[in-house]
Amino acid sequence: MSAPNDNPLCTLANGQPSENPGSVQQVRYGNSNGGLIVLSDTQTLEVLAHFARERIPERSVHAKAAGAFGEFEVLEDVSDLTDANFLTGIGKKTKILTRLSTVGGEKGSSDTVRDVRGWATKFYTEEGIQDFVFNDLPVFFIRDPIKFPSMNRSHKRHPQTNVPDNTMFWDFHNGSYVYVKWHFRPDEGIKTMDADTAVRLAGLEPDYHVKDLFKAIEKGDFPSWGVYIQVMKPEEIKNAPIDIFDDTYTWPFEKYPLRLVGRLTLNKNFSKPECLATQTRIVTGILSILVEKQPANKSSVGPNYFQLPPNRPTNKVYAPYVRDGPGTMNGNYGGDPDYVFSELRPVSVSHRVQMPTHEVWAGHVTAFSTSIMDKDFEQPRKLWKIICEEKGGKEQFLHNILPTLVDIPGKLRNEVLDYFGRVDGKLKEVLREALEKQSKQAHNGK
């Protein structure tokens, strides 16, 4: 059956032709416009039921995002470090999908708010999906993973007032292998936006960065990033100047220089970034931490999120013990046994050897919460010196941070100033004097 003039025939989801997609079956009385809807009105029930379920629940963090397809190309040989297929062979290209986001804001928030930026990339390798998740900061906010939920809540709206709260922000406290730290550096360089421009755009163009990415790709101006790694051998850990497992530190570049791996380019727009499940899969040759992301993806996208096209591997998948549940798209493996080591359906396995040479740990299991030490302020002190050496850097820093300190309780403000004092004693006094000056100006203005 086809519609006149080759226009698509309007149907219900089951294919049943619709005479009028805007009509409602109802009990009519007289000439009024109202009536009682009948339960036999399949079309109305379908439309309303779908509307209430058509959106994927908003993510707890990184809710506002844009996405794009692209490719990763190997530029330098790193086969001495890994046997991961997608990283070996100069010129080898791998399809990728990237999601770029803010962190704290909800889905309707502005792109230009002062916030960390998230970066999630999915590599469609010949050996399966490889996920990477990064932030644009060289360090992470916290050491202890149990503090992760609280840290993110402190960046969100106050549960009582439902508005962002600076008090919450400041109140929260051959089988062999090597360790690497990844760096994605934009080929166009790093460009920042001053606070006044960001505030103005937040009102005039809240989707500023989403539109900028879409338009750039649409006109062929593809953004690209150089992909680098820092490398540390297991035997170097003992004498390393930092704890390499502490994400609040950077690795010294003079001791662990950047090594070029390849280039990542975004060249095709993607309209469904919420379908993208992040940091859920790794391939042989790469080790990573996946604890937090898998449950989050199962909750928001669904238990079979890995079967959605954006999350589906390009190589053949056979995992018959992962079946059933909402959103199954793979035929559910038919009558194959749903348990391992079945003689009814023998399978072959990979024989790539992983030698845990360095994976022998000596110690006692104990409940532990990290404390702040003087060593923790060494890298921030170096960063503060760099800021002071830049033209206008010190002034811009004060302009950005002072508004967040004005309206918080005095005791908490003094604690924050004490922390800045441990970075640099002069910085503490500069902040205190600036706050006192603002307080006097506000008092005189009343």
Regions found by a protein language model. Give the residues of each.
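Active-site-adjacent core segments of small-molecule enzymes
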Residues: 1-446
